[in-house]
């Protein structure tokens, strides 16, 4: 069978070659026998081609149903063919002149030739185009179905007729109405037209043409061939779809569908009036040039007044091949269809209207914003969703972002390529190497503190801070020196501190505290490292040990480069001996309702529920500190932490604790790379009293703010919410607490920002969002903070698979029902099939402290609300995570962006080169709700325990509220016309007295501005 096919193919090729050879031989023989005939045929064919091409370019196909003037030459077809021959001769004349375009033309000679064939008209713009004039707006019959539109149309027509007469021209109204008593025509094209009498007045060379809302049905190129001044009132839409009380329109293909109240529907094409010049070719082959002027009408923004004014006539056909750009200036129909999209773009104001072909709706926005969103969507590493577009529109303050985002998203689908989201290990940055401002080491090779175990789920994943000399110096600069707080407490706050100490340690337990014995300390230390440290130093431990503070960079990941966080370790003897005091003290603190360290997850959730029940008419306030450890001033420690400890313990133990306290707050320290520094009174993050210090400082600030609001001591104490280190959640008491707490922390030298959370929204505390603490224990890890860190672990002492499994075991315990996070953990455990082994202390803690999770649907809905995405998108992303088959195939599900706050080297590039970047906390993303700032002083009928207006507190700002934009001042009966290319407003003229009334309504005035549209 194959041999037969091969034979057929060979025979076919042989026959084809033979036929070609015979044909070439015959043509060559014919050329030798009849050379003149063949030459004439070739030249004739070329000329015929040029004639047909030029004829088609100049004389386009006309719609036989369009309005055309009855005046004109006879034998139009013959004239056009004759003109096409003239154009062909001009083309060959040009080719000979420029040697078929090989040499540039002589512009001086071309201009001299064209000058001899140019007939110019005087500039008619001063006569016909308005200059700060007014138009009488005539009232319409009250029974009219769309009276306002009719008023504009009739008034514009009357104005154009009068202005033409003032200029010395008799008006000729095309498709005239009953109110037109001048020359014009009226033909019958639809049943509605038979209600008026037929007219067809002759057109003279002195007429000026007036088109009022009818040019859509006219062949404007034929009318312009009369070379007469032409004035129009016409629809020039700025959007693809529009509606008001009287009319609405939309585009279907390149036609506009116009509906009016009363049931009328009109469908037609529009003329594209653009630029400052219009060209037309008349039936005699002359090029006619017109000036074009446009004016917008305020109050009737979808219509314009347009003037097409004769400027010059060129009779030499050489214009068709010269540099006149006549073809680009021809008046053509407006086209909005571009593939599957419909687009209207006004380049001067950069107003863009875009929609899908076949849709009745569109989106109006700035062209720059559209291009920015399109570019960001097309460059996404992850699959784009409607929520991505919605978020970008909202950030750009786009008014209708909810309804416009889905429409705009579908407009991108053909242009945006959806790429696979697989990112191979090693193709993304893992660490950043901080560079200090002063004396950095240029030869240092920093250490990689962790290891990557999977591909990241975000496009720009979190980074480890590299360790070394430069990192230590950057830490000192950013975490200690830059935020150092030496502010003294004002007298009022010294008094508040004394009250606070007495409330923490009431009289009933003051002086009763007894430190634990050394043996009890070992029993309470449940970590292996703690017991090993105890066993190593216990036999030789002395009460006179000198503390040695050594700081190291904490192995953790950051969303972007910033000053690394340090841990200040104490001498083991100091840690053990101070624990003898801190452990019994912690038991006292745990009895305080607002004190959350030591509480289990359910107890913390119950406390949050109690906070949420306070002042339910106002928002919840989430505390957000920046570098709290570094901003502790001496007064915070000396007026709060130290007095509380000294007040609780019996007198015989106070001296020893004071010595330990002085050793903890020793003023000399060194880093792991040997850099010395002065920590002053900053919180010692590696001491046994670290959590106590941060939590007490935070709670005191809340207490002081409540006291400033006028609450008495007991009420202020009872209203303190939930506090854990630098995390806090409080009711926004009286709607003003957030202002007072920010004021207090500012006065006391700390860096704080209130994040207001509307009731019903998930609440953020301890890096977790609580769905609804009042009704549910459900919570989930802060999504973007957690998802960006899933791909790496600080544990370098295990294999990649074991490191991934250890991390997954922790999250399967705390977030098994959390979308994406729980899916990642389950998939990692299914792939590795490993149990927990040799995990870090943090991983062990996570595995042993499960946050309750029950309602998966509620968690998913809350997470979607936090991420501002659709639940369907979250489900799709969750499914994408569950489909991977290896650790290096996890997809990118979110786009993230680095916001570097520290000069550093990342993946071979220098980032954060602006050394004066504002410091921000890396604890969580911003969730501040700016729409609910302070409204003023507390209400007098508020809490019965609240006092009067505080004498010293934050300034009272106005609450931002949403509402309608106020109406523009001015006479509503005065309408203004502005230049179509300008956004400036026109100063209103002196108000005119109504001289006449028609139909019981005064005559209005329409004002417009004299400036050109480019």
Curated annotation (Swiss-Prot):
Chain segments carrying region Disordered = 918-1014
Which keywords has UniProt assigned to this entry? Nucleotidyltransferase, RNA-directed RNA polymerase, Transferase, Viral RNA replication
Q: What class of enzyme is it?
A: transferase
Q: Under which EC number(s) is this enzyme classified? A: 2.7.7.48
Q: What InterPro entries is this protein classified in?
A: DNA/RNA_pol_sf, Noda_Vmethyltr_dom, RNA-dir_pol_C, RNA-dir_pol_PSvirus
GO MF entries:
RNA binding; RNA-directed RNA polymerase activity
Tell me the PROSITE patterns matching this sequence.
Answer: RDRP_SSRNA_POS (PS50507)
Does Nucleotidyltransferase count among this protein's keywords? yes
Signal sequence span per UniProt?
none
- Pfam families in the cross-refs: Noda_Vmethyltr, RdRP_1
Q: Which reaction does it catalyse?
A: RNA(n) + a ribonucleoside 5'-triphosphate = RNA(n+1) + diphosphate
Start and end residues of each RdRp catalytic domain: 618-740
Where does the record place Basic residues bias? 956-967
Query: In its UniProt record, which GO terms are filed under biological process?
Result: DNA-templated transcription; viral RNA genome replication
Say what the protein does.
RNA-dependent RNA polymerase which replicates the viral genome composed of 2 RNA segments, RNA1 and RNA2.
Identify its protein family.
Belongs to the nodaviridae RNA polymerase family.
Q: What is the protein's given name? A: RNA-directed RNA polymerase
Q: Which organism is it from?
A: Pieris rapae virus
């Amino acid at each position: 069978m194959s041999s037969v096919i091969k034979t057929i193919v060979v025979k076919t090729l042989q026959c084809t070659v033979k036929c070609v050879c015979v044909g070439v031989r015959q043509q060559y023989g014919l050329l030798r026998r009849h050379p003149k005939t063949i030459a004439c045929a070739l030249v004739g064919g070329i000329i015929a081609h040029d004639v047909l091409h030029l004829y088609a370019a100049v004389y386009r196909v006309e719609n036989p149903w369009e309005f055309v003037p009855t005046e004109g030459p006879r034998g139009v077809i013959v004239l056009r063919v004759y003109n096409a021959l003239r154009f062909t001769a001009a083309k060959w004349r040009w080719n000979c002149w420029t040697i078929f375009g090989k040499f540039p033309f002589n512009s001086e000679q071309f201009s001299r030739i064209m000058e001899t064939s140019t007939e110019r008209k005087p500039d008619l713009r001063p006569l016909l185009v308005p200059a700060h004039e007014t138009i009488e707006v005539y009232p319409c019959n009250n029974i009219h179905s769309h009276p306002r539109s009719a008023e504009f149309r009739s008034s514009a027509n009357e104005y154009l007729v009068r202005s033409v007469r003032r200029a010395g021209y008799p008006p000729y109204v095309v498709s005239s109405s009953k109110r037109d008593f001048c020359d014009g025509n009226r033909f019958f094209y639809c049943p509605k037209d038979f209600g008026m009498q037929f007219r067809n007045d002759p057109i003279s060379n002195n007429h000026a043409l007036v088109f009022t809302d009818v040019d859509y049905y006219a062949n404007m190129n034929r009318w312009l061939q009369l070379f007469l001044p032409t004035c129009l009132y016409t629809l020039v839409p700025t959007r693809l779809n529009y509606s008001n009380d009287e009319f609405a329109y939309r585009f279907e293909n390149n036609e506009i569908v116009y509906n009016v109240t009363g049931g009328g529907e009109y469908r037609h094409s529009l003329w594209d009036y653009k630029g400052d010049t219009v060209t037309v070719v008349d039936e005699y082959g002359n090029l006619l040039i017109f000036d074009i002027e446009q004016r917008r009408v305020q109050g009737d923004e979808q219509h314009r007044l347009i003037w097409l004014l004769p400027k010059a006539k060129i009779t030499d056909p050489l214009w068709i091949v010269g540099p006149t750009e006549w073809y680009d200036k021809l008046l053509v129909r407006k086209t909005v269809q571009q593939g599957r999209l419909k687009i209207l773009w006004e380049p001067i104001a950069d107003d863009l209207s875009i929609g899908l072909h076949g849709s009745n709706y569109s989106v109006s926005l700035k062209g720059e914003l559209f291009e920015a969103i399109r570019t960001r969507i097309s460059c996404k590493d992850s699959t784009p969703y409607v929520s991505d577009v919605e978020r970008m529109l909202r950030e750009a303050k786009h008014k209708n972002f909810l309804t416009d985002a889905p429409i705009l998203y579908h407009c991108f689908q053909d242009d945006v390529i959806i790429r696979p989201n697989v990112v191979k290990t090693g193709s993304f940055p893992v660490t950043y190497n901080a560079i200090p401002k002063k004396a950095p080491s240029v030869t240092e090779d920093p250490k990689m503190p962790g290891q990557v175990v999977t591909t990241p789920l975000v496009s720009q994943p979190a980074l480890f801070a590299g360790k070394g000399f430069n990192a230590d110096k950057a830490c000192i600069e950013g975490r200690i020196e830059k935020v150092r707080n030496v502010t003294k407490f004002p007298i009022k706050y010294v008094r508040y501190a004394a009250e606070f100490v007495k409330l923490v340690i009431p009289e009933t337990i003051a002086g009763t505290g007894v430190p634990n014995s050394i043996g009890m300390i070992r029993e309470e230390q449940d970590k292996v490292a703690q017991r090993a440290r105890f066993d190593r130093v216990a036999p030789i431990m002395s009460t006179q040990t000198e503390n040695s503070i050594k700081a190291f960079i904490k192995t953790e990941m950051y969303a972007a480069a910033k000053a690394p966080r340090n841990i200040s370790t104490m001498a083991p003897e100091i840690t053990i001996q101070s624990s003898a005091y801190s452990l019994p003290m912690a038991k006292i603190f745990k009895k305080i309702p607002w004190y959350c360290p030591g509480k289990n997850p359910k107890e913390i959730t119950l406390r949050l529920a109690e906070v949420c029940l306070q002042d339910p008419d106002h928002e919840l306030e989430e505390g957000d500190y920046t570098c709290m450890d570094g901003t502790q001033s001496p007064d915070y420690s000396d007026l709060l932490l130290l007095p509380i400890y000294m007040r609780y313990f019996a007198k015989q133990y106070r001296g020893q604790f004071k010595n330990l306290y002085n050793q903890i707050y020793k003023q000399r320290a060194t880093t792991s790379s040997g850099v010395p520094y002065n920590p002053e009174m900053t919180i010692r993050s590696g001491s046994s009293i670290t959590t106590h210090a941060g939590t007490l400082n935070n709670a005191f600030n809340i207490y002081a703010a409540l006291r400033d609001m006028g609450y008495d001591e007991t009420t202020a104490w009872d209203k303190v919410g939930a506090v854990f280190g630098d995390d806090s959640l409080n009711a926004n008491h009286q709607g003003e607490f957030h202002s007072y707490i920010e004021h207090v922390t500012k006065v006391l030298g700390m860096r704080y920002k209130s994040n207001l959370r509307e009731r019903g929204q998930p609440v953020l505390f301890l890096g977790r969002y609580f769905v609804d603490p009042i009704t549910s224990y459900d919570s989930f890890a802060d999504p973007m903070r957690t998802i960006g860190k899933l791909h790496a672990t600080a544990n370098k002492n295990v294999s990649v698979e074991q490191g991934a499994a250890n991390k997954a075991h922790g999250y399967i315990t705390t977030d098994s029902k959390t979308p994406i996070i729980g899916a990642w953990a389950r998939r990692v455990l299914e792939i590795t099939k490993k149990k927990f082994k040799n995990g870090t202390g943090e991983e062990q803690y996570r595995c042993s402290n499960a946050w309750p999770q029950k309602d998966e649907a509620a968690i998913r809905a809350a997470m979607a609300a936090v991420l501002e995405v659709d639940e369907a998108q979250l489900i799709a992303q969750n499914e994408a995570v569950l489909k991977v088959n290896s650790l290096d195939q996890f997809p990118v599900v979110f786009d993230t962006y680095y916001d570097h706050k520290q000069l550093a080297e990342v993946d071979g590039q220098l980032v954060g080169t602006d050394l004066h970047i504002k410091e921000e906390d890396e604890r969580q993303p911003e969730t501040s709700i700016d729409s609910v700032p302070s409204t003023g002083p507390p209400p007098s009928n508020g809490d019965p325990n609240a006092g009067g207006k505080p004498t010293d507190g934050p300034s009272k700002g106005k609450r931002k509220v949403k509402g309608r934009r106020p109406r523009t001042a001015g006479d509503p009966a005065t309408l203004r016309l502005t230049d179509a290319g300008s956004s400036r407003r026109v100063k209103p003229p002196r108000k005119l007295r109504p001289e006449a009334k028609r139909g019981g309504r005064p005559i209005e005035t329409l004002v417009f501005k004299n400036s050109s549209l480019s």
